[in-house]
């Protein structure tokens, strides 16, 4: 998988791939990470990439020309690149999207700044547009990193233990059940006793029940989307 970040601030993104799981993924050639700065493609003086909005409005927008030339170059080098824009005015990214996009060979994340990007560029170049939640960030870099991380961990060989994916939140429509480690008692709080008895069949059943309870409490929206037969089985 190749990730290309179109960003004015490479140094905000690059360090994330220098440690832990994603650093190993880069080292093992599971992912390749590249950065392109639209300033390198602007025709304006002083590497200008922003301009005031037509029709008024607070703040500046990223101009169309630098981004257009940047994306044109990327597309010429790889016609199959999948171009993703990050903006709060889009659908929320989810785990299903992460698993689907893990099948791509090259994803380009376009990271907006200022008050956003000239809409014509989004319409011309976007294969998909995502947001990471109902809130505003100062730029698209953090959102792009969220997507890249979620996608990368679904690429074969990136995680050391592939079973980790199967039991994570959202894999079956539920939040992940609570987990515990040593010591058995911490500050007067006990690990659920059934977890200590070694009966893995009972532990699986209990974890499933706890996952249902957790989802129903914290994410009733997800719980309502569960298949009726799954909810009925839990509620009996």
From Swiss-Prot:
Belongs to the RNA methyltransferase TrmD family. NCBIfam families: PRK00026.1, trmD. GO terms for biological process: tRNA N1-guanine methylation. It is an enzyme of class 2 (transferase). Specifically methylates guanosine-37 in various tRNAs. This is tRNA (guanine-N(1)-)-methyltransferase. Its EC number is 2.1.1.228. It is found in: Cytoplasm. InterPro entries: Alpha/beta_knot_MTases, tRNA_m1G_MeTrfase_C_sf, tRNA_m1G_MeTrfase_TrmD, tRNA_m1G_MTases_N, tRNA_MeTrfase_TRMD/TRM10. S-adenosyl-L-methionine binds at residues 112, 132-137. Homodimer. CDD domains: TrmD-like (cd18080). The keyword Methyltransferase applies. GO terms for cellular component: cytosol. GO terms for molecular function: tRNA (guanine(37)-N1)-methyltransferase activity. Keywords: Cytoplasm, Methyltransferase, S-adenosyl-L-methionine, Transferase, tRNA processing. The lineage of its organism: Bacteria, Pseudomonadati, Campylobacterota, Epsilonproteobacteria, Campylobacterales. It comes from the Bacteria. It catalyses: guanosine(37) in tRNA + S-adenosyl-L-methionine = N(1)-methylguanosine(37) in tRNA + S-adenosyl-L-homocysteine + H(+).
